[in-house]
């Protein structure tokens, strides 16, 4: 793509390749949400409903990191492995995907998240847990989600979207999984560490609990959008070149 924001064309968005990409996003998001929500439910079952402790936080963060690593990897060669409306939004603002195709990515991701959350609730018989604030207000929660999502989408650009990435692209799914796991360790006890509107929306639909759901749309979209704009216009402009290793 040219790197400029583009609306796109319906014939491109409904091509065979695009339809396959939507299916890939649906499946990848379903896999990620099933694993992520399932880890939270498993912790609740194994601890008899005890509050999340440090060991549990690490376990949930690791499961989300591993789950996203796999979800991105299985979709990378088909759809790019976005698995997240905030990632798609950031890539659209950076001109890496058209707005129209991005909308269909969102639909696929949200449907995948809903199905994943409903399936894990059905299989376990346990109410689906949702993201929520703990010890912080709505404003602080939004800021936290902006920061952690900025880090996630910046990582996506640096390891997967930047045409200068070279061999770094081969470890993109690992890096993306690592940053999500690390961010959950930081933000989990406060905002929940969503970074992903679909990850929050799917469980909200499955449980019928939409409390503060707007935080998990506003924060990630602002953070993802900022990361896309910063990386696109600072590092992917025509006159930028990477520093040679001998110059460090």
Swiss-Prot record:
Query: Which membrane topology term applies here?
Result: Multi-pass membrane protein
Pfam families on file: MIP
Q: Which GO terms describe its cellular component?
A: membrane; vacuolar membrane
Q: What is its main location?
A: membrane
Span-the-membrane segments of this chain are 21-41, 55-75, 87-109, 133-153, 168-188, 210-230
Q: In which tissues is it expressed?
A: Expressed in roots and leaves.
| Annotated GO biological process | one-carbon compound transport; water transport
Upregulating conditions: Down-regulated by chilling.
Which keywords belong to this entry?
Membrane, Repeat, Transmembrane, Transmembrane helix, Transport, Vacuole
Positions occupied by motif NPA 2: 196-198
The record ties this protein, via SUPFAM superfamilies, to: Aquaporin-like
Per UniProt, what is one GO molecular function of this protein? water channel activity
What residue intervals hold the motif NPA 1?
A: 84-86
Q: Which CDD domains does the entry mention?
A: MIP (cd00333)
Where does it live in the cell? Vacuole membrane
Instruction: Give the protein family.
Output: Belongs to the MIP/aquaporin (TC 1.A.8) family. TIP (TC 1.A.8.10) subfamily.
Check the record and name the NCBIfam families matching this protein: MIP
What this chain does, per the record?
Answer: Aquaporins facilitate the transport of water and small neutral solutes across cell membranes. May be involved in transport from the vacuolar compartment to the cytoplasm.
Query: Domain note for this entry?
Result: Aquaporins contain two tandem repeats each containing three membrane-spanning domains and a pore-forming loop with the signature motif Asn-Pro-Ala (NPA).
Protein name per UniProt = Probable aquaporin TIP2-2
Q: Please name the source species.
A: Oryza sativa subsp. japonica
